[in-house]
Structure formats: C-alpha cells, structure tokens
C-alpha cells in the first residue's frame, strides 16, 4: 500500500505544479484574462471612433451644411459679403500685451 500512496502523492504534486506553474496554468489564465479586459476597452474606444467617423461621412455625403462647416472651421473660408470676427481669449490677449509687438487690439480682429 505504501508504493501506491507514494505514486499518488507524486501524481498529485505533478498536477499541482502543472496547475500553478506550468504552461496554461493559473498565472497564464490571470494574465490572459487581464489582457482580454484591456483589449475589450480598446475595442470599445475604436468602435465609438468608427461610429463618429461613419456619422461624419454620412453628413458629408448628404448635406452641404457639414461641408460648409468644415470649410469655415478648417480653412477659414467665409461667404461673400460676410464679416468674420475671431475672438481672442483673455489669456492670449494678456500675453500679447506683455510682449513688444505692433499688434493693437483692433488688429486682432480679422475680417
């Protein structure tokens, strides 16, 4: 009976080693589980970004308003006879006053 007990203890020890320290053991499982959570978060961010891009594509394909908005914001285009005023934030206005320049407050308004 002693040999059978010894054999079973050795088998149990080998199984415990495989479970805790072996390939595809508990440590690998926990690491992969954490990686899956991180990847799911990245996938959710990318899915939101894709939805925004698809919405923007639909706007650009469907209407002139989106094209006009992009032309105004990115290219600074204005319609004929229209005046464009750029408001300078207060912090930029202070920095402009402290630095010696030829800009006056009336020059900060663009037409």
UniProtKB/Swiss-Prot annotation:
Oligomer status and interactors: Part of a complex composed of FtsB, FtsL and FtsQ.
Family the UniProt entry places it in: Belongs to the FtsB family.
Protein name as annotated: Cell division protein FtsB
Disordered: annotated span: 90-111
Pfam families: DivIC (PF04977)
Membrane-spanning intervals of the chain: 4-21
Membrane side Periplasmic: residue ranges: 22-111
Topological type in the membrane: Single-pass type II membrane protein
Signal peptide annotation: none
Free-text function comment from the UniProt entry: Essential cell division protein. May link together the upstream cell division proteins, which are predominantly cytoplasmic, with the downstream cell division proteins, which are predominantly periplasmic.
Compositionally biased residues, Low complexity: 95-111
Recorded superkingdom: Bacteria
Coiled coil feature spans: 33-63
InterPro entries on file: Cell_div_FtsB, FtsL/DivIC
Subcellular localization: Cell inner membrane
Alphabetical GO biological process terms: FtsZ-dependent cytokinesis
Statement: the UniProt record of this protein carries the keyword Repeat: no
UniProt main location, coarse: membrane
Cited HAMAP family: FtsB
UniProt GO cellular component terms: cell division site; cell septum; plasma membrane
Swiss-Prot/TrEMBL keywords: Cell cycle, Cell division, Cell inner membrane, Cell membrane, Coiled coil, Membrane, Transmembrane, Transmembrane helix
């Amino acid at each position: 009976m002693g040999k059978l007990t010894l054999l079973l203890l050795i088998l149990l020890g080998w199984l415990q080693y495989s479970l805790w320290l072996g390939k595809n053991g508990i440590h690998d499982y926990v690491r992969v589980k954490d990686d899956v959570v991180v990847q799911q978060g990245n996938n959710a961010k990318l899915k939101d970004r894709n939805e925004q891009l698809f919405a923007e594509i639909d706007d650009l394909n469907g209407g002139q308003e989106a094209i006009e908005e992009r032309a105004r914001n990115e290219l600074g285009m204005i319609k004929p006879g229209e005046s464009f005023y750029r408001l300078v934030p207060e912090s930029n206005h202070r920095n402009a006053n402290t630095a010696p320049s030829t800009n006056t407050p009336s020059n900060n308004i663009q037409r």
